[in-house]
């Protein structure tokens, strides 16, 4: 079972992914939690480069895909073969929304690269944590992180369009309190997992 968390920065993805990981462990599931980019030795090196270097859009895209390819090969496929529940903090929709809708790279090209990097592995369910950009920016400011409003608006729009096009995407209103959002996540998962 592969569960992907998606959403703009400040939507609460990381918090909710960790919360679900702990919850499922307590329920007796064998669970893995990985972040993108990252999750492997190579992926963490690429993450550091992506977060600290000034990169053009193409280089950035290829590094994200390289990190993803290594994570799929080294961790996700073996975990799925062992019947683990794999939780991802970001996956393919983030790349399409950020690099495609946000930065203007060709969306179809990114989808093809995603297919190549993932070897066709797809989430059983994608939880898109949707939040108005103003609320996300306020949350980010509290963590001393800053993003461009116009850019995040484009990315959010991209995520919402992808949610209509792609299979198995559930949009969750992430503007509420942490516990309310988690209850919505459990409701969404009840169709694919005994929670």
Swiss-Prot record:
S-S pairs: none
Protein name (record): Thymidylate kinase
Database matches in NCBIfam families: DTMP_kinase (TIGR00041)
One Pfam family cited in the UniProt record for this chain: Thymidylate_kin
HAMAP family named in the record: Thymidylate_kinase
Record's catalysed reaction(s): dTMP + ATP = dTDP + ADP
Residues noted as binding ATP in the record, renumbered to the chain: 7-14
Ranges that cross the membrane: none
Gene: tmk
Enzyme Commission code: 2.7.4.9
Annotated keywords: ATP-binding, Kinase, Nucleotide biosynthesis, Nucleotide-binding, Transferase
GO cellular component, one term: cytoplasm
InterPro entries noted in UniProt: P-loop_NTPase (IPR027417), Thymidylate_kin-like_dom (IPR039430), Thymidylate_kin_CS (IPR018095), Thymidylate_kinase (IPR018094)
Biological function: Phosphorylation of dTMP to form dTDP in both de novo and salvage pathways of dTTP synthesis.
Family the UniProt entry places it in: Belongs to the thymidylate kinase family.
Molecular function as annotated in GO: ATP binding; dTMP kinase activity
Keyword ATP-binding included in the entry's annotation: yes
GO biological process assignments: dTDP biosynthetic process; dTTP biosynthetic process; dUDP biosynthetic process
Keyword ATP-binding found: yes
């Amino acid at each position: 079972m592969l569960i992907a968390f998606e959403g703009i920065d400040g939507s609460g993805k990381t918090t909710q992914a960790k919360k679900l990981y702990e919850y499922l462990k307590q329920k007796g599931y064998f669970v893995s939690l990985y972040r993108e980019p990252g999750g492997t030795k190579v992926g963490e090196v690429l993450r550091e480069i992506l977060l600290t270097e000034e990169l053009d859009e193409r280089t950035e895209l290829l590094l994200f895909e390289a990190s993803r390819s290594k994570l799929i090969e080294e961790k996700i496929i073996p975990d799925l073969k062992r019947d683990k529940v794999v939780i991802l903090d970001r996956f393919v929709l983030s790349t399409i929304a950020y690099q495609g809708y946000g930065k203007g790279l060709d969306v179809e090209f990114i989808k093809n690269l995603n297919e190549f990097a993932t070897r066709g592995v797809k989430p059983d369910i994608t939880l898109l944590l949707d939040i108005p950009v103003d609320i996300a920016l306020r949350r980010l400011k509290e963590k001393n992180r800053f993003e461009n409003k116009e850019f995040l608006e484009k990315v959010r729009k991209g995520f919402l369009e992808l949610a209509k096009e792609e299979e198995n995407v559930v949009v969750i209103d992430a503007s509420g309190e942490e516990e309310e959002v988690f209850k919505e996540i459990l409701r969404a998962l009840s169709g694919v997992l005994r929670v």
